[in-house]
Amino acid sequence: EMCIRDRDKLFVQEGRKVFREVVPMVAELIEKHLNDNSLAADDLRRMWLHQANRGMNDLIAKKVLGRDPSETEQPTVLDEYANTSSAGSIIAFHKHKEDFYAGELGVICSFGAGYSAGSVIVRRSA
């Protein structure tokens, strides 16, 4: 039974549950996106992921790549900007694109409220 002091707790995020469910969901989304475009994880030079949780991003990248990602393959801006919601992946892209060269492929992926997720495959032009 809810009491008056609990009014601010009508909506509670179940962080561990979200983590367990979002990691495979996003990894599968990226893998499907790559497959739909006849690409493999090995084709990716970089993954700019939603900047909410470093551990979550590390596991997503590991599932997609089949190994631990390097810091250049999956950069983070969490230490500098914290969680900026859906803007995080674009901020990471902006801050970590200078050594992304012509012809290289990457994926930008954001995910969040309501288990929404989206990705875009990018190829650096000449």
Language-model region placement:
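Short alpha-helical interface elements
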Residues: 58-62, 69, 85, 118-121, ...
